[in-house]
Amino acid sequence: MPQLSRRAFLAGSVAVAATARAPFVHAQKRGGTLRFVPHADLKILDPIWTTAYITRNHGYMIFDTLLALDADLKIRPQMVDKYTVSKDAMKYSFTLRDGLKFHDGTPVTAEDCVASIKRWGGRDQVGRLMTASLNKMVPVDRKTFTIDLETPFGLVLDALGKPSASPLFIMPARLAATDPSEQVKEAVGSGPFKFVKDEWQPGNRVVYVKNPDYVPRNEKPSGAAGGKRALVDRVEWRYIPDPATANAALEAGEIDYWENIPLDFAPRLEKNPDLRVFVTDPRGSQGILRPNHLQPPFNNKAARQALLYAVDQQKYMQAVIGNPKYYKACPSLFMCGGLPYETAVGAPKPDLERAKRLLKESAYDGRPIVVMDPTDTPYAHAPALVTAEVLRSLGAAVDLQAMDWSTMVQRRAKKEPPAQGGWNIFHTWATAFDVMTPAVSAPLSGAGEKAWFGWPTSEEMERLRAQWVRETVEDKRRALAEQIQRLAFDEVPFVPWGQFEVPGAFRKTVRGVLQFGATLLWNISV
């Protein structure tokens, strides 16, 4: 069976990756401290347990990957030195490169890799699809392991090198033995930076130091691939939840790099000659309204359909983003922009009266709908406010509960009723890497309690997603994507509230920033 094209797997990343060709670092100053303001507070250290981007970015600081996606959408070896694929693409062999060492001093072995893949495959949505196709996966010696498939799965290399939500980060086997439903509390990787646990102050600061034992590939950095060179001795993540304070700190030179700036600050920062404002992901992000399928009222399809018809993307974008330069309404669950799986099939038009009728048909009993509101994250806080007003316009009672982003990320894992600490709705966003195809889109999964937070159950959705992965003919893949979208707009696993771009900013003394669909802090000097 021929391997599925990377274009099919990560099609939406084309525009992102095409601009990510940062030059190879040459005469840059080395050493010093990079002072970085992340988009949220880091509270969860396990990038397999959660898909939260703050934890993914932490993962890229300290972990490494077997394979990686470069700026040209090519999967390249990273920890792997060489690999082979049988002619029928049913057998794979991977050999690690020399010099790989975990931060605790132990060597990285094939056993660690197999254990990490197994844990990731029990949690990640693409990993689950791959795991379902496995016959066996075993270490051959300390540096080599093999994967044998039971049924065809053309995305093995792409899955092992997926760049986001969740990348396959390699950790020691003793940590990878942790049940994927439980968090790993110890942050031990083999990547270019080490996590300094003693200096971690949740709600304030995260510290990383250069890993002197890390041996980068002798290649130019390219996307998430190539040589990962730590050019600073220390990276400090400084959590500043108040945008005005972060803005003042950046302009005063007290910080170097602000990951996600609120759009109303962009015009001022663009005029500052000492700063550069840039769009972190030119393809944009998809806004996501996620209902809890386990608890009333959204365990009823009619209530979820009420949400779908009540959401007017233009109104959300005007309220959340404001500047049309940075947003557009998009009817496709696979995002818009001339992409292979972009389609308007099945997309309804907003209809508030129909939404009211559907909510009434759902037998909604008037209990308050708990909407989690992360007030420190503009791209989740603002849509929460809009949704609260939309629900009230439908005649629903709303309990808008304020919290920070990291608290919301932890709480959304709770399956209990809202009265016992659970929830009904949360808002987030996903970059192109994470929603562009039926395989990578975690919000589409219908795997029940093994699905992404919100836990929709749909055997038909899982059947179609598995069929999409096995299909090799592009026209048939497009047709399957349309079937999946039609089904999703009927079952409503989530509601898209628009497509938008998120800018970041850094001082011009900062060099080597990689523009990619994930925040990467190697290659940077100050």
Model-derived features: positions:
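N-terminal lobe/hinge region of extracytoplasmic solute-binding protein
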Residues: 37-87, 118, 188
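Ligand-site clamp/hinge motif
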Residues: 216-268, 397
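Periplasmic binding protein-like
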Residues: 105, 389-445
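Extracytoplasmic/peripheral linker and loop segments enriched in polar/acidic and small residues
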Residues: 399-413, 438-508
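Surface-exposed binding/hinge segments that line
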Residues: 95, 129-176, 181-201
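Long beta-strand-rich cores associated with HINT superfamily self-processing modules
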Residues: 506-526
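Periplasmic-binding protein-like
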Residues: 294, 298-337, 382-383, 488-498
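Structural transition elements
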Residues: 193, 325-361, 375-382
